[in-house]
Amino acid sequence: MYKSLFTASLLALAIAAPVAQAHQAGDILIRAGAITVNPEADSSSVKVDRGGLAGTDLGGKATLNSDTQLGLNFAYMLTDNLGIELLAATPFEHDVKIKGTVLDAANGKLGSLKHLPPTLSLVYYPLDAKSAFQPYVGAGINYTWIFDEHVGSAASANGFNNFRAKNSWGLAWQVGADYMLTDSLMINAQVRYIDIDTTAYVDNTALGVRAKVDVDVDPLIYMVGLGYKF
């Protein structure tokens, strides 16, 4: 659904007739809209790495749900064709679930977490500044800050009382397009891929037992919204 919405938005931008001049060196762009993180999660099996059962492989895989929040972009045009951009958003929330382990009691919700994915990118706009339609590509670096972790029902039922996950650094890529409705107002559609790798842990502090799972979150991120140029 998200891919279809993004594609339709780009097509609508592409066929519209130019009405206003687009980006120039020194412009400041602010965009806001609905942003969806869709994890393409792959993971290791669940392993006990601390306590009397250390080294035990429980099998299984981790999954994360999608979430939609308010997305924000702040960009500065270094030249007519090159800009620097910061992605921000309100916190995303995900449930980390486990399925397929050798112990049925271990399957289910491992924990929940929130995260912020600030991403700094260099963005290239190939078309002339006079074009109202401005497709672009970009690449940059992401820092995913994970916080507000809570142990899940499946983990707590097995005596685990703590859940946490590591923050992540990774590369990010994006494609998108602006279409100028006026000299200042634009509509925008964009999609990103971000390399997010984390390790989630659950602890049974009373018994000194810990289990972990490595997760390649690697989400596709879709955003559609409006922007304003200063």
Set out the residue ranges of the language-model regions:
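Gram-negative (and chloroplast) outer-membrane scaffold detector with strong preference
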Residues: D27, E40, N73-G152, V217-F230
